[in-house]
Amino acid sequence: MIDRYKHQQLRIGSVSPQQISAWAKKILPNGEIVGEVTKPYTFHYKTNKPEKDGLFCERIFGPIKSGICACGNYRVIGDEKEDPKFCEQCGVEFVDSRIRRYQMGYIKLACPVTHVWYLKRLPSYIANILDKPLKELEGLVYCDFSFARPIAKKPTFLRLRGLFEYEIQSWKYSIPLFFTTQGFDTFRNREISTGAGAIREQLADLDLRIIIDYSLVEWKELGEERPTGNEWEDRKIGRRKDFLVRRMELAKHFLRTNIEPEWMVLCLLPVLPPELRPIIQIDGGKLMSSDINELYRRVIYRNNTLTDLLTTSRSTPGELVMCQEKLVQEAVDTLLDNGIRGQPMRDGHNKVYKSFSDVIEGKEGRFRETLLGKRVDYSGRSVIVVGPSLPLHRCGLPREIAIELFQTFVIRGLIRQHLASNIGVAKSKIREKEPIVWEILQEVMQGHPVLLNRAPTLHRLGIQAFQPILVEGRAICLHPLVRKGFNADFDGDQMAVHVPLSLEAQAEARLLMFSHMNLLSPAIGDPISVPTQDMLIGLYVLTSGNRRGICTNRYNPWNRRNYQNERTYDNNYKYRKKKEPFFCNSYDAIGAYRQKRINLDSPLWLRWRLDQRIIASREVPIEIHYESLGTYHEIYGHYLIVRSVKKEIICIYIRTTVGHISLFREIEEAIQGFCRACSFGT
């Protein structure tokens, strides 16, 4: 992401406990170090002030009101003459309250806790780097198993190696004796480890370079083996090779990013800034709190209980300590990702708690909703419908959307034309929808392009510029040929409208992003604006016409199909004007169609300009009709020629339909527009 500090990216990864401590700890001017959250409380029920060392402590996270401490004293922020910079009574610094949006705290865990993302998510990074089954590691983390091994290469008392289950018969009665024996803590810390601490010790002992070398050698050995013929064994070898590749890549990633594997086990738990997990007071004095606050409270309660048990470990049974460590691990798991281990935790109203993972992931998460796809001003959204009468570079904006997007421009136009004295009067005219408002809106829209975007924007054509026009209704009208570039369908898809404000954005929209300038695919160069199937069917219906021909007899196959119950006995068929009307131009023909005097496929005679191809044709006429004044008509299959007494051509009529005429006019207008554009460019 790009911000005011020119950061070009945001990377999420593991951090060291020292880094977490550096994020949260701060030294007050009196030398006191604060940052650790030790109490599970939020606000005092009587004073409504944050509890000291609690989840909303002002000493840790900063003052609620800028320059005002918890005691109510005020200091001017940034004034060097004001001294001291903090309240000596409550220890709150006199700083801006916005610090509560980024100042973090931390919880010092009484026992190590594995990060559930690295343990339970697939693939499990902890299981991959340790080369152990996930089920075995889960049993160790949640204290179902213990891990016995020499620590720091010292001599051992027990002849145990690896994992062992506490409930096996050989240790069922002997180990409890050690749990209550004086000095058991020293023995346990020396030879027996359980919980996330055992995982942390194993991760800390790893040599990543040796892992890469050994994995590569094993991968080569497996690659040299020939197929055994046993499908199960061959698949097993293939899976092992894939696992070794993933393990080497993970180890290389740790080396490349200077991340230690033991950082996947937490010793310090970061606490989010208070403004990111707020408590809001609603009507009636009731408080609404973020679910994360309740999950943090649960972690602090269980962690404090474990701390008390460890401080009195001489009188505390070891089983109770292990059980409490498991509860702390489960509380942290719920905070980070509720429900990842099965049944999610719910509140008193049977509502699932929203954990940290739920806050950041998904369509409504922090990244997609507020960082990647946050809503912006001068934008709208609506369903798209087809607008076949629109030019390729235009789109239809509903009046309701257009007046909101261009409201500031309309207000400026009303004030400039002295139709409104101030902004308030202009807004009242817009609310009343006076006719002058729509006139000014149309003037504004003529010189201002808009950007249409359909998510997901996977390539350059996912956002294009259009010249807007006002349309009725509440849907955005779009030319059907631009559908493919957006990968959209007219079956309920929605598109966003944006108004480019700066001159640079408007110039880019006009010169690079207009839809009629993006006719080719940027990936492969093929045409992107091609007729769809419904357009092809429409063109076929438009130009199919009546194919019976000028001659009608019982041997004509088209006549026999369409008129099976009719018989034509007039073999000497003659041309008759009443059946096929004459028109002097295409406008008259289309007008007759709109008046429903003829059909779309009805044959008609249209007067045509003199065509040398027709004049020079040697085709023999089918019939010749003579008029009383000496003129005569030479009738051919698809045209007729009217000649004078001196055999001079007076005019030519072609036999066509209204559908052919409409298509011809569209092609002619397109060619003329292209010629005008070329002449303008030269």
From Swiss-Prot:
Gene3D superfamilies: 1.10.40.90, 2.40.40.20, RNA polymerase II, clamp domain (4.10.860.120), RNA polymerase Rpb1, domain 3 (1.10.274.100). It is found in: Plastid, Chloroplast. Keywords: Chloroplast, DNA-directed RNA polymerase, Magnesium, Metal-binding, Nucleotidyltransferase, Plastid, Transcription, Transferase, Zinc. Zn(2+) binds at residues 69, 71, 87, 90. In plastids the minimal PEP RNA polymerase catalytic core is composed of four subunits: alpha, beta, beta', and beta''. When a (nuclear-encoded) sigma factor is associated with the core the holoenzyme is formed, which can initiate transcription. Mg(2+) binds at residues 489, 491, 493. GO terms for biological process: DNA-templated transcription. Its EC number is 2.7.7.6. It is an enzyme of class 2 (transferase). PANTHER family: DNA-DIRECTED RNA POLYMERASE (PTHR19376), DNA-DIRECTED RNA POLYMERASE SUBUNIT BETA (PTHR19376:SF54). GO terms for molecular function: DNA binding; DNA-directed RNA polymerase activity; magnesium ion binding; zinc ion binding. InterPro entries: DNA-dir_RpoC_beta_prime, RNA_pol_asu, RNA_pol_N, RNA_pol_Rpb1_1, RNA_pol_Rpb1_3_sf, RNA_pol_Rpb1_clamp_domain, RNApol_RpoC1. DNA-dependent RNA polymerase catalyzes the transcription of DNA into RNA using the four ribonucleoside triphosphates as substrates. Its main location: plastid. GO terms for cellular component: chloroplast; DNA-directed RNA polymerase complex; mitochondrion. Belongs to the RNA polymerase beta' chain family. RpoC1 subfamily. Pfam families: RNA_pol_Rpb1_1, RNA_pol_Rpb1_2. Its cofactor is Mg(2+); Zn(2+). It catalyses: RNA(n) + a ribonucleoside 5'-triphosphate = RNA(n+1) + diphosphate. Binds 1 Mg(2+) ion per subunit. Binds 1 Zn(2+) ion per subunit. This is DNA-directed RNA polymerase subunit beta'.
